[in-house]
Amino acid sequence: MRRPSMIRPFLVAIVLLAALPAAADALSPKQTERCKAMQATLAPKQAELLEATEKRDALAEQAEALGEQFEDAQVMRLASSSNAQAADAAKAEFDTARRAFAQAEYALQSSARQFNQDVADYNRSCTPAK
């Protein structure tokens, strides 16, 4: 499930990329070059965010599936010692998947925050005041 807050930076970047020619008319040649350089960094960062989002989503699905497997194994825990061992193994896998998901989520949020800051810097520097 994609979050609307992750889509917003992408839409902002697209609008900014389309607005560069209009903004360039009001800037000096030196500022225009700097803005073009800033603009060139936005697309790769946007692609990285998309990849990170896909990775996070895949890890979320994996953690969810392992969580369900753990719950199923937990129900049978008291039936035998082998079921208890299976439940312990399922819990360990689930915990590992949750940690991987949490790390991916944190990295994605950090990258999105930085991307939003870069877009704000671009807007501040490269968009003429009205």
What would you call each of these model-derived segments?
Residues 1-6:
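N-terminal secretory signal peptides that target proteins for export/translocation
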Residues 19-23:
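N-terminal signal peptide c-region/cleavage motif recognized by signal peptidases
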Residues 30, 129-130:
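Short coil/loop "hinge" linkers that interrupt or connect long alpha-helical coiled-coils or helical hairpins
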Residues 48-52, 56, 89-128:
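Amphipathic alpha-helical coiled-coil segments
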Residues 24-73:
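Immediate post-signal-peptide N-terminus of mature secreted/exported proteins
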